């Protein structure tokens, strides 16, 4: 059966897990949030668009995997507070999602993408996401 119209949307999702540290810079944080502590972060990058390219890719998955490999190397075992992208900022899980989103957006060809969503889990209970239209 052939479809003459297609109102569907393609999505591509890749994730990564790594341990990184941070401390929150808010007034009177609950322990241990005000001191350096570790989280096993899981980062999920979801790309979406309504058309595929020449090879039926939304984006080349190898490019996205390589970009996430680079991000994992940057953040694995790092204290987020010490990195320039968090200078003067509270390194909340929400902020971390935005930082990763900006880096993914800058590192990929986005000509076929409509949206980019980054979800970051800091543990089994808490996650934040940042979604942007492209």
State the predicted function of each range.
Residues 1-134:
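Charge-rich, low-complexity N-terminal segments
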């Amino acid at each position: 059966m052939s479809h003459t119209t297609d109102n569907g949307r393609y999505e591509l999702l890749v994730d990564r897990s790594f341990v990184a540290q941070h401390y929150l810079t808010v007034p009177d944080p609950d322990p241990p949030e005000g001191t350096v502590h570790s989280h096993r972060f899981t980062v999920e990058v979801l790309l979406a668009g309504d058309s595929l390219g020449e090879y039926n890719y939304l984006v080349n998955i190898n490019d996205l995997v390589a970009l996430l490999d680079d991000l994992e190397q940057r953040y694995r075992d790092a204290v987020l507070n010490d990195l320039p992208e968090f200078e003067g900022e509270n390194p909340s899980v929400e902020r971390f999602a935005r930082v990763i989103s900006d880096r993914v957006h800058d590192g990929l060809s986005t000509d076929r993408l409509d949206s980019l969503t980054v979800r970051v889990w800091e543990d089994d209970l808490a996650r934040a996401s940042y979604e942007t239209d492209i």
